[in-house]
A protein has these predicted regions:
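Conserved loop-to-helix interface motifs that mediate assembly, gating, or partner/ligand docking
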Residues: 2-171
Length: 171
């Protein structure tokens, strides 16, 4: 009887310890989320200014559709940029993003996927792991962008996507 009591107490202690660890992890993830939200808020003025500048350029360009980025072309090679977190401490966010990406591939880009003309740029470890396990063509050059998130890092990613489109690697 006393052995069972000791075992129950040990289990209770173990559960309490796990609860403490979980609470600490929640606090750490909340702090990181807040830091990421602050970084995004700080980038908003840059993004709106960039959007304004691009609008001015397109509207001031004679026949604006002559620009490489504005030209319409048949979709042959697809680039899908999937942004997930590095860890699973964000509720259903990663699962929802992955489901949405899979649904988009199935509904819009099934032919490109079947012919091997679909590439996924995975930003965040969870998305990279998810799509690699399922055999998708995953480019992980920006997978660790959240390790040191900055405007410069995001800018490099955006420039790479624009350059790939301009060079007609992707449509």
């Amino acid at each position: 009887m006393s052995g069972q009591l000791k075992e129950v107490r040990l289990r209770i202690k173990s559960v309490q310890s796990t609860q403490q660890i979980t609470k600490a992890m929640k606090m750490v993830s909340a702090a990181k989320l807040r830091r990421a939200q602050d970084a995004i808020i700080q980038m908003r003025p840059y993004a709106s200014k960039l959007q304004e500048m691009l609008s001015n350029i397109v509207s001031n360009t004679e026949g604006g559709s002559n620009m490489t980025l504005a030209e319409e072309r048949q979709v042959k090679n697809v680039l899908m940029i999937v942004i997930t977190s590095d860890r699973g401490l964000c509720g259903a966010y990663n699962a929802n993003i992955q489901k949405m990406a899979l649904a988009t591939i199935k509904e819009k880009y099934a032919a490109q996927y079947a012919s091997g003309n679909l590439t996924i740029w995975a930003i965040g470890k969870k998305g990279a792991e998810f799509f690699q396990k399922r055999g998708y063509n995953v480019d992980v050059r920006f997978k660790d962008i959240f390790m040191k998130l900055s405007f410069g890092a995001v800018q490099l990613c955006a420039q790479a996507a624009v350059q790939a489109f301009a060079q007609k690697e992707f449509d």
